[in-house]
Amino acid sequence: MNNILSNSIKSLRYWDDQTVKAIFDKYQINVSGIYNISDDILESDLKLHIAQLLFLIVKHKEEFSVYLGETHLEKILKKLVKQFKYLEIRFLGKFKGKKQFFIDISDLHVDNILEKTEEIIKLIKKQYEYIKKQKKRRLDGVYVGIAPRKEKRGDAGAATAWSYIAFDFDVEEWKTNKMPTEEEIMEKLIKYLSKFVEKDILPHKVAFTGGGLRFILYPERPILEEELILLRMIAEDLGADIAMYDLARVDRLVGTYNYKEKYGSPRPCVTIAQLTDEEDIEKLLTPIILYEKFGIIENYKEFEVLFNEKREELYNKRGLNNITTTINRLIKKPNLNKTILQDINKRIYKWLYTIQDKLTKKLGKRWIEKLLSYLGIDYKYGKNGTRLDLWSLFFDDGKNPDCSIYINEGYNAVMVDFHDPNMRFIALAGLWMIKEFRDKIIEFLKLHNINPKPSTYRTVREIMNELLDRETIKIEAEGYLPKEAIIKAYQLSIEQGVPVFLKADTGRGKTYTLTRNTREIKEVFKKHAIAVAFPYKIQVLQVGAGLHADGVVVPMYYEDGKKLDKNTIHYLTIGTYDQVENMLNDLCYDTYKGEKIQVANEEDILLAIDEAHDLVIQKEFRKRAITGVKKCIDRAGGCVLLTATPELINLNNYPVIEVEFKDEKKLFERCSIHIAKNIIGEFCEYILLMFRQGWIKNAVVLVDNKKMIENIKYTLELYGFNKPIYVITRETVGIDKASKMIINEEKVPEEGLILATRVISEGVNIKNHVDLVWALYCKSATTIRQFIARCRNGGGELIVTAPFKEREEEPMIIDYNAMIEMFKENYKLLKEYLETDIEVLKELDKNYKKVLISQIQNAIYYDEEKKDWVLDEDEIAHIYNSLLEAHITRDYKLLKEYLEKTTGYEFAIKTIKELKESKLDKFLKYNYLEYLEKVSAKHIIIAFKEYGVNEIKNALEYNNYKKFKDCRDEYTPQLIKKHSKRINRSINVLKDVYNIPEVIEVYNLMLNKGKDDDKKSNLDENTIKKCLEEINEYKKIVKEINENEDRKTKKIYHIDLKLLEEHKDKLSTLARIIEELILKTFLCPPSKWGKIQRIIRAVWNIVVGEDDERLDRRKLGLRSLVAKVLIKVRDFAIERQKFKIRELIEVIKEECGFTLTLDEVRRLIRAIFNCVIRGVKKLGENAVVEIKELNKEFKTLYEIIKQNINSNSVEKCEKVIEKKIEENGGEILEMELYELIVEKLKFVEEVFYKALEKLKKLGVIYEPKPGLLRIT
């Protein structure tokens, strides 16, 4: 900054004549010269301006400067300045000929600046002369691109970064045919210049443009596209034009004329003030200091983070809007943007909605007008007075209102931002976004006696920790729950008249102690009997069976009715929730000679509710039963709520007695939080790996969704999962083998997979060892914790799945008490809140929103006794708990914190890849030889031959596979697994196998001999050995042929198709292997196909069959009929679009001679098309099929395979063989036959590998499966 500024002008707010004179004398300010300016002087000004601009570009290209806080920009800028290739000169107006010229500046340096300047001057003069010769012409002016171009284009895609900064001040009164006077120009110059000086900034030059003034600043580095919004903010602050800040902007050249017709005669665009010495031109402006002086950026660190994290990834995508949004966070000036509005939706949007409703009730429908007046915001009425238009709220471009507010129903007033029409939001949210308005909005609310209550929204973490940390009455114990704890709980319940929670770890014998000590407990309180309620029938049966084993038979009540025995006792009754009222009635009354006699009052009955957390968690689908339990709790003489997990459900803050046990409990060996993008796919992938490798024998999985269980079961069966799968739901309890074992033996099967809903998490015991316990899907954190505790003796591995989150954000919900108040105040607003909040949870379950919203309908009910509407707070507690627990299960960090606090386990956060790798690494360390046998034969051979056993052993132990460079890819555990069951289908292995001494054993492994029955090869060891001997003989023959130049003397086998048939016995070994492997490759390609395997087969058969004129021929395993059927199905469906299944069956039968079944038609259609099939169950073959479009996966595969297989590039195996036989005069070497087939198979394999790479992106698992039709 120049001395004269810092010493004499810096502190002055108003300029006096002496100060102005000092500046003018120092810095060559000349206004009077513009009135009689000559062409020579104007040309000199043009040369100086262009030379300064070129010097600046050279400076930026060779060595630009960055501020201390901007070191992160250096990498970005270096990349940009390399793209400074062209300077655009543009002529604007109406004339014939070229208007854009691009000067090559790629070789620009200090020594050729003057040469380039002269080149530009000559170009401008030449174009001037050319335009003057035209009779019909109108030239507006000559312009230069502020940003150098990387291509010969003038759009934003070719622009790089601004080389200088310009602020244009348009003066409306100058835009007439009257030239402004010297005094008028001086007045405006002083006015605008003083705004810069007050900020301690001095422009490098000022130019008169004809209709205003331009202030030019030379920065020490290029100005990035993202920074233009900052310049726009400064321009708005200065009162300059804000519409010029786009990257491709062209600026009127200083030293030329402004030819606009409204001026009457041309006006010079000329420098009137050079405020920097020519020799000091290198003293350039630091951009971030400019932003700081004008108060635009709050701190440098955020500015640095912006470019460090955001710029690099968004620059290539030209994501200016996203970057601008981030910049807006750093700007102190009011500015509305989508990102911050998204934050509002999560945090206070719902609160603002309630405030609008209160304002409408208090001030009427047009409250918004009063608020705008209070905030000092000017507005105008739009059409019919239903709209308010606001200017200068965010940006004033002088054309459109900045935004409009549509009044509608007052509380639903909507604001629309005209700078981004997609942004629509409630009016109060838009005003609240401007920080300067918030205090005044609060003042306005208090002025009208409206309590804003902005603190009623809290983070889920805060609420969760508050509930977990509540004080409890602690009792110490060892082993099992003492009866004194139960007596203490009943005593507290009777004294306070409220139910009391008895908290004890699962597996500590809560129900055992209660049911075995009933007589003593009831006698302490002089009560008649105790009734114990359980959520499920399975628990009633399990407890009843235990008592029966001890010689005690009790009345048992469950869904099917009452079940009594002659020798039952009458001081203890057990039953399910829905039978509690029946239990109380039967305990209070007895029947004598057909008459009902009361033997006790309800106050004489003690009630115990097992798994009491279900009273809150399960209310949405067990409303009637739980409502009956709640009524009985109020009627009974005392109530104890038994649970191990009362924390998140105890919203009413009932007393809690917590029993702490001193002895150590058995833990799981490993505990993980699994972050899943594809829950079913990743689960199936891991389960298949674990069971197939023999690493686990049994697994218990919580899947609280019956449809998901069906999908998992179907998927696993599709993949060839051959272990027993047991499904336990409420309907199958006591019926299937697994649930019977749990009830009667407290064990799960030693082998197999158990998929269970939440019924397994309630009161059951699993006392044998479980290799894998997995909470896969459940929207209740309490239920997950209960499920984990079912395994009384721990287990091998514990996994809890949480969905993957793209955005890391702290979830928030309204405070519980505030929620009740909101409900009382306005039911409609609570519904709005829930609909907004549940939108966050939509990934959990599509029906979840509907379920919760339906509960609101019953939260307020009409009480016939009170003759008034009553709020059911239990219903609100259920809704609130559901939201709270769903947020916890959806956020893996919250879930980890909750489980670690409540279980005592330590959980590691892992993806499915990390889960598999950790398991593989541990296994390889101790079982490398066993795992080596499962590796693909091809890689075993290469590794053994080249490196030996010891090298393989070291590689597997130390996880270092780089040395296996001869393998197709890097030799990693993932690659080993990928090829372990696929390479066996490639006949290429036969080339290498014979070199291995243990050939029989390796080849047995290659063919999976002795493994799954359905995958056994028909080849025995003798056959393989014979085959290998033949191959050795063929190799000798080939060697002889190569050594002998005369082909006539070569020893060959004369083979044609007939001869091959005649010598079938002699050559059967090799032929059988070739045919078997070809069939496997064609019908079961060497990739693991999953749920879209039908699509793959459909595509393959259509592609390979499309150009074949002999579709009915079959040789070497080609299934031509399949292709013919598929092609006809596709063509028929595309042509008809809508048809009955029967019509398609008839066409295929007539033209292909093959009758399709109903299931085959459905599989074919769904494989090829995105379609709707209506009424299949009812109408059968008369069901209507409506085709929409080709299946997306079908399209993708079709393109891949079609590009690689066509009649021109690859012919069918039989064609190739026939052609080869014909070329050899009816003879062919068996080795040649072998090589032909190998080459064909290899090509097919490569095609499917390409398809597989595409399919991997879908995130599904693949496994071979029988084809679409019976003939495949």
Curated annotation (Swiss-Prot):
Keywords: Plasmid. The keyword Ubl conjugation does not apply. SUPFAM superfamilies: P-loop containing nucleoside triphosphate hydrolases. InterPro entries: Helicase/UvrB_N, P-loop_NTPase. The keyword Chloroplast does not apply. GO terms for molecular function: ATP binding; DNA binding; hydrolase activity. Pfam families: ResIII (PF04851). This is Uncharacterized protein MJECL28. It comes from Methanocaldococcus jannaschii (strain ATCC 43067 / DSM 2661 / JAL-1 / JCM 10045 / NBRC 100440) (Methanococcus jannaschii).
